[in-house]
Amino acid sequence: MKIGCVDVDGHNWPNLCLMKLSAYHKGRGDTVEMWRPEGWYDLVYKSRVFTDTYSKDNIYIANADQIIRGGTGYGPGPDLPDVVEHQRPDYSLYPQFPDTAYGFLTRGCPRACGFCIVSGKEGRRSHQVADLSEFWDGQREIKLL
């Protein structure tokens, strides 16, 4: 399968979900790349962290058999399946961010800020969801999300 990835936010920060989906599909032998308007894709993932107040989804895709949209920017929805969630991210999807690892050690937040959906989606208690070894492979920098 040929898989395309669209980072709808595209604001100088890699999309962790897309990197995990890329790793999953590459592990199955699929070809994965950032989506381009030319060519044809079997499947395109559009991932969005922020809502319209920050990132408008003006990306029209007409060159794919199937399009899957996901992420908090599209509202509540299903979580990634565990087999994808616990993949080591495919950092090659974002070569402009070399030698940096990205991931979550915990989920949830006790603060419940009005502008943020995290406490409503993930709970008001912080709980461990991963070990550092799940997303770090010796990179010089680690960014915890």
Features from the language model and the residues they span:
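A short, structured N-terminal alpha-helical element that caps or precedes a catalytic domain
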Residues: 1-69, 75
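Arginine residue identity/basic-tract feature
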Residues: 28, 36, 46-48, 69, ...
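Conserved Radical SAM active-site core
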Residues: 1, 41-43, 61, 101-106, ...
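Short boundary motifs at domain starts and secondary-structure transition points
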Residues: 38, 92-95, 134
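Catalytic core of nucleotide-activated saccharide and alditol-phosphate transferases
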Residues: 61-122
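General structural signal for secondary-structure boundaries
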Residues: 55, 90, 128-131
